[in-house]
């Protein structure tokens, strides 16, 4: 028995495609496929790996679930939240998390533009809304927009995925458009 685990951020449906390809090539093989995306931040990868705030595992069989549960047993014992779901949901969670954070950054930058035009202090606005436990203060720092190796590509990938299934994500698309507009016209 082999369990193939995808750790990378991959388009929704990749796990199923990997499984189908493997079954076609080796119909007699005993295996499962799992999606287990990493949530490592740039500059904090080692800490995030050792002390993740959550683990997301997409599986489609009890056998795969048990293997992954045993693999993550040390984190389970430390009460790290572990979310077991199907592969497509696991793949989507990774994109949704990164896109949400990118959209939050875009939001505070839009508020910064408004503050500049009406004479308000964006840092006080960010502090005031960030104290709301439902919102939180992280990613409420006005600046050049989101970047890095993940947020831009994951945002556009999620927009394209939604378009392919006729479920447009207008807020996310506008967030990406805003980022591009500010790159070319600061």
Regions found by a protein language model. Name each.
Residues 148, 152-176:
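Helix-enriched interaction subdomains in cytosolic or periplasmic regions
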């Amino acid at each position: 028995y082999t369990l193939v685990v995808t750790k990378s951020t991959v388009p929704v449906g990749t796990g199923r495609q990997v499984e189908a390809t493997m079954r076609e090539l080796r119909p007699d093989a005993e295996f499962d496929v799992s999606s287990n995306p990493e949530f490592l931040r740039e500059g904090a990868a080692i800490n995030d790996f050792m002390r993740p705030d959550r683990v997301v595992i997409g599986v489609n069989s009890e056998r795969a679930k048990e293997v992954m549960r045993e693999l993550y047993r040390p984190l389970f014992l430390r009460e790290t939240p572990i979310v077991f779901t199907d592969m497509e949901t696991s793949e989507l969670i990774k994109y949704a998390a990164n896109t949400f954070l990118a959209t939050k950054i875009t939001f505070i930058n839009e508020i910064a533009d408004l503050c500049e035009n009406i004479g308000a202090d964006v840092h006080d606005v960010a502090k005031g809304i960030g104290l709301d436990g439902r919102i939180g203060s992280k990613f409420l720092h006005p600046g050049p927009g989101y970047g890095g190796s993940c947020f831009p590509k994951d945002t556009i990938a999620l927009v394209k995925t939604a378009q392919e299934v006729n479920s447009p994500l207008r807020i996310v698309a506008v967030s990406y458009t805003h980022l591009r507009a500010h790159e070319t016209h600061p």
